[in-house]
A protein has these predicted regions:
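Bacterial Sec-dependent N-terminal signal peptides
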Residues: 1-32
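Compositionally biased, intrinsically disordered low-complexity regions enriched in proline and serine
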Residues: 3-6, 11, 37, 84, ...
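Intrinsic low-complexity, intrinsically disordered segments enriched in polar/basic residues
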Residues: 6-7, 21-26, 84-92, 160-162, ...
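Short glycine/proline- and aromatic-enriched beta-strand/turn motifs that initiate or cap beta-hairpins
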Residues: 26-73, 77-79, 208-216, 225
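Flexible, solvent-exposed coil segments and beta strand-coil junctions
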Residues: 29-36, 84-92, 149-156, 180-186
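Outer-membrane beta-barrel transmembrane domain signature
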Residues: 44, 57-59, 98-225
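Surface-exposed acidic loop/strand-edge motifs in secreted or periplasmic proteins
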Residues: 73-109, 132-134
Length: 225
């Protein structure tokens, strides 16, 4: 990581600490209209699967801020077109081993809040991320096979090595949420992260738990004349 990336990473860390402190100290005030944790899962480009955990605050019914952590497993972006995975069986149970690239993304984003209905809302945000992920190197090699009656294997036609790289990325996300209870809701959203390691685009669904800021039902009273 070069000095610029280290500086940006330090700034992101300070931003995360500030946001956490701000949300913790003001969550009970009128400035924070909604405050909730979210946990989600989804999929995206590069045949990726992902898990997302974070916290989001809606401020003054106008702004939103999110601190999130994502863990992704993906097909390496530089995987050769003729790549063949290792295959075989053990105790007559077949298996396939494909090399994967793992990535973690810690993001601090902020943006706008849009009220869509009584208890539905959307957010659009952008910000910076600290990204750590695998860079996979492929080297062509000879395919070999072997078996011992109850087990057999055929190696891949590429030998692989992994390096862990770090980068600063640009994060963008848009989410749609529905608070079906005062403390719980559901959501879905899309995201992307542009960085020098591998830039995924994905979709996720999530469960949200916290202060939903649901509107109370209006009770009409009829007064006799």
């Amino acid at each position: 990581m070069n000095s610029t990336q280290k500086k940006l990473s330090y700034q992101i860390g300070l931003g995360i600490l500030f946001l956490t402190f701000f949300i913790t100290t003001t969550a009970q005030t009128k400035a924070i209209n909604k405050f909730y944790l979210h946990a989600g899962a989804g999929w995206g480009t590069y045949e990726s699967g992902l898990f997302d955990l974070g916290v989001q605050a809606i401020i003054k019914n106008k702004w939103s801020a999110t601190l999130s952590y994502q863990s992704l497993t993906m097909r390496p972006k530089n995987r050769p077109a003729d790549y063949q995975p290792e295959t075989g069986y053990v105790l007559f149970i077949p298996y396939t081993y494909e090399v994967e690239a793992n990535m973690t993304i810690t993001s601090l984003t902020a943006g706008r809040y849009f009220k869509l209905g009584k208890n539905t809302w959307a957010t659009t945000e952008g910000g910076l991320s600290y990204v750590s992920g695998d860079k996979v190197n492929f080297e062509r090699t000879e395919v070999t096979s072997g078996n011992i009656i109850i087990a057999a294997s055929t190696t891949s036609n590429y030998q692989t090595t992994k390096e862990t790289k770090s980068s600063v990325g640009v994060a963008m996300r848009a989410d749609l949420n529905w608070g079906f209870a005062s403390f719980m809701g559901l959501g879905c959203g899309v995201f992307t992260n542009i960085n020098s390691i591998q830039s995924p685009i994905g979709f996720q669904v999530k469960l949200i738990v916290g202060k939903m800021g649901r509107e109370k039902k209006n009770k009409h009273k009829t007064e006799g004349l």
